[in-house]
């Protein structure tokens, strides 16, 4: 009620705005591979695919899978395999961004030109593993705990939390508490993660600048 009172105080006199355009539906997705010569010092590569929109329930298991694959943690699969074990890339990460009517999942890395193909092979190996081999109970439990810890840390930023809450209110007409979010993460199963990985990671596009 306090928030409503503050909003009414500052915005009640403002006229409502109406969108003057109709958003076109995303075109059918077709995977591609493209290499562009940019004469860069390193090879820069993005491997990605269309993913779930913000209204789909499967966005949460995909977010967890993406975090396991290449999230902001030293023990992500790609960081261990590509960077730590083989020393092929200093910068490698995966991200998932949901939009109103679609989404995108992407893996980015940079490397010496001579290491790019090996990096791609290792990445494809991890994608295949996530699609075909379910996580063990221990692996899943550790991944959930880490993801929840990351969410808890990010919620300490008031600005970040309020932006997320505002988006949730606009899209879902409600705001989950952090405990509700944690409960949804804890309820995810290894099968759910394998299923979304199979659907999203099976037909990836590739763009290379070198």
Question: What is each model feature region?
Answer:
Residues 29-30, 41-43, 47, 61-63, ...:
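A generic structural signal for well-ordered coil/turn residues at beta-strand boundaries
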Residues 47, 57-70, 77-82:
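Active/ligand-binding-proximal structured segments within catalytic/core domains
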Residues 75-76, 157:
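Short linear Ser/Thr-Pro motifs
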Residues 1-55:
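An aromatic/glycine/proline-enriched structural segment found at the starts
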Residues 1-19, 52-53, 70, 84-210:
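Charge-rich, well-structured scaffold segments of protease-associated domains
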Residues 44-63, 158-163:
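N-terminal short leaders/motifs
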């Amino acid at each position: 009620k306090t928030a409503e009172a503050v909003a009414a105080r500052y915005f009640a006199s403002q006229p409502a705005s109406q969108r003057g355009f109709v958003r076109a539906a995303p075109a059918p997705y077709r995977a591609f591979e493209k290499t562009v010569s940019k004469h860069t010092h390193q090879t820069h590569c993005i491997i990605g695919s269309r993913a779930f929109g913000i209204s789909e329930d499967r966005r949460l298991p995909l977010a967890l899978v993406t975090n396991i694959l290449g999230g902001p943690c030293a023990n992500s699969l790609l960081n261990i395999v590509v960077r730590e074990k083989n020393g092929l890339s200093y910068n490698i990460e995966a991200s998932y961004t949901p939009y109103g009517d679609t989404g995108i999942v992407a893996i980015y890395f940079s490397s010496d030109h001579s290491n790019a193909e090996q990096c791609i092979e290792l990445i494809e190996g991890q994608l295949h593993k996530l699609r075909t081999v379910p996580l063990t109970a221990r692996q899943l439990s550790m991944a959930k705990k880490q993801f929840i810890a990351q969410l808890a840390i990010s919620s300490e930023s008031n600005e970040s939390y309020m932006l997320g809450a505002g988006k949730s209110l606009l899209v879902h007409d409600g705001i989950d508490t952090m405990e509700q979010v944690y409960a949804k993460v804890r309820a995810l199963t290894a099968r759910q993660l394998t299923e979304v990985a199979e659907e999203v990671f099976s037909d990836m596009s590739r763009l290379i600048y070198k």
